Design a protein with these regions (language model features):
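Rossmann-like AdoMet
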Residues: 1-69, 88
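Class I S-adenosyl-L-methionine
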Residues: 17, 182-217
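Well-ordered beta-strand positions enriched in small/hydrophobic/aromatic, beta-favoring residues
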Residues: 35, 172, 210-211
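Histidine- and/or cysteine-centered catalytic micro-motif in compact active-site loops
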Residues: 40, 146, 177
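Conserved beta-strand signature within the Rossmann-like core of class I S-adenosyl-L-methionine
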Residues: 169-176
Length: 217
């Protein structure tokens, strides 16, 4: 059964935390478990099929995944929807997940990690700092960073794309929530300049735009 963003109902509150900058809750019913931030669903998991994707922008990401990936980096994994999906698709792949919010990583481990899959390596770090310090090479990077009203400024500046160019030899997929056409144009220009050929794909009915870039250098 699909997770309906307009009609879901919770039977249990599994976790609640509130800070000045955000409120986190994890809820569950007989079929699904989900993570809400300030009342907005950020991740959703089927209890019987943890690898399924439910949120509106995620099929667009799944359609643009490469045929194969063995070294995956997730910047801003949230509740790990794509981490679980990729773990089922490529069981032998090595997966690193980076998040600035330590609580998000802890909640992923406690409530959203699929025990049947190879465990990802979790890193509590700033995304740009992690990239600058990393000595690893990746063939797939998923970039899904957000702030209260969209994406952080970082996604519209050159340094993160320059850092990605150094460690990426394959596919970059970015989940954008552009506030203006100028933000979208800026992110696409930077991805094309530093990564390679880039295409933008809107999600009907939502702000999300998925950027797909390829670096084969």
């Amino acid at each position: 059964m699909d997770f309906n963003l307009q009609a879901y109902q919770a039977d249990h509150l599994l976790h609640l935390s509130a800070k000045p900058e955000r409120r986190l809750s994890i809820l569950e019913n007989a079929r699904h478990r989900w993570l809400e931030m300030d009342g907005v669903v950020q991740s959703a998991m089927s209890l019987s099929q943890p690898e399924r994707l439910f949120l509106p922008h995620q099929p667009s990401i799944a359609e643009r995944l490469p045929a194969q990936a063995s070294r995956i980096l997730g910047l801003g994994p949230g509740g790990g929807d794509l981490t679980r999906h990729l773990g089922a698709r490529w069981p032998e792949a090595r997966h690193d997940c980076v998040d600035l919010d330590a609580e998000i990583l802890t909640l992923f481990q406690q409530f959203f990690q699929d025990a049947s899959q190879r465990s990802p390596r979790l890193h509590h770090a700033d995304a740009l700092h992690f990239l600058l310090q990393s000595q690893d090479a990746y063939d797939l990077v998923l970039l899904d960073l957000f702030s209260q009203d969209g994406n952080p400024l970082l996604l519209f500046q050159a340094p993160i794309y320059q850092a990605l160019a150094r460690c990426l030899h394959g596919t970059l997929i970015v989940n954008l929530l552009p506030r203006t056409h100028l933000e979208l144009a800026q992110a696409k220009r930077l991805a094309e300049e530093w990564i390679g050929p880039t295409s933008a794909h809107g999600v009907p009915g939502y702000r999300n735009v998925i950027l797909h870039a390829t670096n084969l250098a």
